[in-house]
Amino acid sequence: MIKVVLIEDSKTLAGALKAALEIEGIAVVWASDGVQGVAAAKREKPDLILLDLMLPKLSGFEVCKLLKTDNATWRVPVVIMSTLVDEESRLRATEAGADYFIAKPYDLAASMAEIKKYLKM
């Protein structure tokens, strides 16, 4: 089964995205802060990581950099989903190792299409 780690501090957004992914047959592990997210990604060995940038404990930039420099997770694609859409934030995310960027608020159908591309569905 395809597995995604969703690192998002908004329970509402996480719930909506989790439900949409699960309808597609994708297992979702949700983490609500950066520390939990890093631990979940290492433990679960997901096919994809969906990552917010504005998180408690560790920022999404820090999480991405940690995951992309860890032998257990460096190959896992990281898709940023954030309201921080300015050029500097996008550049920082890319420098941290992010593979793709989806701006919030996002269109769920369009976002699911992009996510499916990374999952090769």
Which residue stretches match the model-derived regions?
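Two-component/phosphorelay signaling modules centered on CheY-like receiver
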Residues: K11-V29, Y118
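Active-site beta3 strand of CheY-like receiver
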Residues: E44-L50, L55
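C-terminal output helix
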Residues: K18, Y106-K116
